[in-house]
C-alpha cells in the first residue's frame, strides 16, 4: 500500500472504506460464530445492513480513483500472496535485465573501439573518417 503522504484524498477515502468493509465482514463473522440465545435479535440484521451499506459505497468511491493496478498484481493477491513480494521480485528482475543489457552495451562499445583501431591500423588513409564516424555516433560512452 502507498504511504499515507503519497495518497490522494480519494485514495485515502477508498482505503478507509475498504477497511470499514473488511471490519464489517469480520464483525458479521464474529456475531454468527458466537451466536447464542442471549445475542440480540437485531445483531445480525444490523451487521448485514452495515456491510451492505459499505459495499454499496465502494463503486462510487472507486470511480473517483484513477489508479490502475496491473492484472499480474491482482492475480498475485487473489492467490493469497503478498503484493510487496511481487514488487520486490519485479524490481529484482528489472535490475537483472538492466545489468544484462548494460553488459551487452559494454561489449558492443568495446568491440566498436577495437574494430575501429584495427581498421585504422590496416587502412591509415581512412583513420580520419573512422574517427569522424566514432564521434558522430557517440551519445554517452559507458566504456572507459
Swiss-Prot record:
Molecular function terms, GO-annotated: transcription coactivator activity
Does the keyword Signal belong to this entry?
no
Cross-referenced Pfam families: Med10 (PF09748)
Give the record's keywords alphabetically: Activator, Cytoplasm, Nucleus, Transcription, Transcription regulation
* Gene Ontology biological-process annotations: positive regulation of transcription initiation by RNA polymerase II
The UniProt record lists the keyword RNA-binding: no
What are the subcellular locations of this protein? Cytoplasm; Nucleus; Nucleus envelope
Q: Name one GO cellular component term.
A: nucleus
Q: How does it assemble?
A: Component of the Mediator complex.
Q: Which family does it belong to?
A: Belongs to the Mediator complex subunit 10 family.
* Protein role: Component of the Mediator complex, a coactivator involved in the regulated transcription of nearly all RNA polymerase II-dependent genes. Mediator functions as a bridge to convey information from gene-specific regulatory proteins to the basal RNA polymerase II transcription machinery. Mediator is recruited to promoters by direct interactions with regulatory proteins and serves as a scaffold for the assembly of a functional preinitiation complex with RNA polymerase II and the general transcription factors.
Q: What is this protein called?
A: Mediator of RNA polymerase II transcription subunit 10
This protein's species is Schizosaccharomyces pombe (strain 972 / ATCC 24843) (Fission yeast)
Gene name for this UniProt entry: med10
Amino acid at each position: 500500500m502507498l504511504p499515507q503522504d503519497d495518497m490522494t484524498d480519494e485514495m485515502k477515502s477508498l482505503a478507509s472504506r475498504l477497511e470499514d468493509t473488511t471490519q464489517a465482514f469480520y464483525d458479521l463473522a464474529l456475531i454468527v460464530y458466537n451466536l447464542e440465545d442471549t445475542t440480540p435479535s437485531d445483531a445480525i440484521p444490523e451487521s448485514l445492513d452495515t456491510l451492505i451499506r459499505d459495499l454499496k459505497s465502494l463503486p462510487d468511491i472507486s470511480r473517483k480513483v484513477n489508479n490502475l493496478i496491473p492484472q499480474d498484481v491482482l492475480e498475485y493477491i487473489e492467490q493469497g500472496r503478498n503484493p510487496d513480494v511481487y514488487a520486490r521480485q519485479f524490481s529484482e528482475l528489472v535490475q537483472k535485465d538492466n545489468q544484462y543489457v548494460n553488459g551487452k552495451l559494454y561489449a558492443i562499445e568495446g568491440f566498436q573501439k577495437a574494430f575501429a583501431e584495427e581498421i585504422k591500423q590496416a587502412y591509415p588513409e581512412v583513420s580520419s573518417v573512422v574517427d569522424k564516424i566514432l564521434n558522430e555516433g557517440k551519445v554517452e560512452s559507458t566504456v572507459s
